[in-house]
Amino acid sequence: MIGDMAHKYRNRNKEFTMANHLVIVESPAKVKTIKKFLGSNYEVDASGGHVRDLPKSQLGFDPEHDYEPKYITIRGKGDVLAKLRKEVKKADKIYLATDPDREGEAISWHLMKALKLDELKNKQVYRISFNEITKNAVKASLKSPRDLDINLVNAQQTRRMLDRMVGYRISPLLWAKVKRGLSAGRVQSVALRMICDREDEINAFIPEEYWNLDAMLNVAGSKKPLDAKYYGLANEEGAKGSKSAIHSKEELDVILKDLEGVSYVADEVKKGERIKKAPIPFTTSTLQQEASKALNFSTQKTMRIAQQLYEGVEVKGHGTIGLITYLRTDSTRVADEADAAARSFVKEHYGENYAAAGEASAKNTGKIQDAHEAIRPTDITLTPVMVKESLPRDLFRLYQLIWKRFTASRMAPAVYETTSVKIRAGKHMFTTSASRLSFDGFMSVYVASDDEEEKKQVIGAIESGMELKLADLQPSQHFTQPPAHYTEASLVKAMEEQGIGRPSTYAPTITTIIARRYVAKENKNLYVTELGEVVNRIMKKSFPSIVDLSFTANMETLLDRVADGTVAWKTIIRNFYPDLDEAVNIAQKELESVKIEDEVTDEVCDLCGRNMVVKYGPHGKFLACPGFPECRNTKPYLEKIGVPCPKCGKEVVRKKTKKGRLYYGCEANPDCDFMSWQKPSTEKCPKCGSYMVEKGNKLLCANETCGYRMDKPAEEQK
């Protein structure tokens, strides 16, 4: 009996003394990593992200009561909170160790409120944060705890309320007039507009003809001819000249006539040196862009994998460790210790002359949030080779990209020896250039995916005044290209440049507009769907400020000011909501007066004989029987454009790819394979007889080698 009492006492004593510190993080993955760094008197548990939010079924705050938000426990988080309350009872000190950003600060604040930590009398509650999940970083944060930063909490709360206002008030209008289940978002609507605007630019673009003229010149002592490109007319004094384009075959013929029998003389030879600077470390935006281009990762996949690398993975010989610093950042700053370690690593493994001299990082701009670092490896000595066996393929590829970029950022520039030559040919001038890598510097470790390959040609021993022998003149016809469709990478870059969104919002925004089928992705390119076009038209007409880029960018700036405590969060809400409320009320009245009737077609239902109507589906328009639900017959919608097929004479119809990209094909498909990305015209090219396509108020020959163009008839011009 005494033994039993002693056993119970030991258990009670163990329960009291061994878990008197509680660390709360967001994810179970972090729990696993951090537990290995701390002693047995630390309990580490996870909240699983947010535990409270605005209720889904209502706005979540009352404008009549000064917009005070009403938070409720998220469904499924009751058990999580119950478990955390038990752990809190056992602990003397509680550390809120959520992510080091506004979202993380807000999660800690909600945990404080949900667990009533601010009401505890005999326990100490702290906020700790760390930029990397390593033993040193976690232990250092425990030595320097702080209070919650209510300004960061308010900034996140304001963003959440603004997003709720837009979604809750505008989405029902889209349900009523377009399709149930659609959503309008404050940032996603702007991203959609950017894609729609780019599509409009592409559709309105009219290609301009131009010609290149290459002179292939033999140089004494060189096996390969030198490729020199036409530059323009030379000045009387010599090679300076004026650059001019060749706009047509007629202009080309005049130049070719001038060049008959002339000598080609090197008028100016310049030798020099070009410095290629090392890249700066990754931010969230640049990591997403480079991972898209180099690894073909979506923004969502990049963030998911980076999250795993940050939270911790098992590395042979090192245990569980966070391999990279925090992944949501727009800073290029690097901690002094990490900078020194990287430079030392470079000197040891590559040589003294490969290490960067002086400041290697770009200065942060006014948009930079909080005191974050750039994305970098937590330990530069953990090279990709050392961790390869421990990581799944995609984790390894992203880690390798981050490691190489950061290492390169601490290295010396690459150096090229350059030679440029200006060649006079009668009254015309040609130019050529070449470069040779003389010192690879950072390029021994890292070359960005979009770096242009250096010219491979070698310029021989050419001196000013030397005559070169013409081997061949090679003209080539080209046409200017429209702006490129956005990719995920280029959209993120454009959003960052315009100040739309922040590191934490880029990937979710793009994921949402694709998931909602407003945008489709095909071969990396983003195309707006018919559904996206309809939503964008409504947003631009009824809520112009919501989709205005400068308005949205200014709102991000105001949120930054809330975060630094210079603007009160309610000031933003009080200014925003009344204007939104008025716009919604006006839009409701306007849309109520617009009755959207089903478009009746001449197509007869082959099951019941009714005239079929046009409906909208996930992939655009289709034909449906109006007798639904008695008759459920549907057919593809073939929208005829009144133009005969250039191949077989049947009707050309407007179609969309599965990804939502518009094109024109023959109604007789698959028997006829005619297809065009541009809208065909009834006009024939007077020059070559091919069919013509519409581009704005112009008609262009579909035969690219022809290049003929003309104005549309006046009655067809917009």
Please tell me what each predicted stretch does.
Residues M1-R160, G232, K243-I246, D253, ...:
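Intrinsically disordered, low-complexity regulatory segments
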Residues A6, R12-K14, A19-L22, K32-T33, ...:
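Basic, low-complexity terminal or inter-domain segments flanking catalytic cores
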Residues T33-F37, K83, A106-A114, A137-S141, ...:
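Alpha-helical scaffold elements adjacent to nucleotide-binding pockets in ATP/GTP-utilizing enzyme cores
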Residues I133-A215:
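C-terminal or mid-to-C-terminal helical accessory/interaction module adjacent to the motor/catalytic core
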Residues K177-S183, C196-S248, A294:
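C-terminal helical "lid" subdomain and adjoining coupling/linker elements of P-loop NTPases
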Residues E237-I280:
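Metal- or metallocofactor-binding catalytic centers and their adjacent structured scaffolds
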Residues T286-S298, V492-R502:
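Short helix-coil junctions and helix-kink-helix linkers
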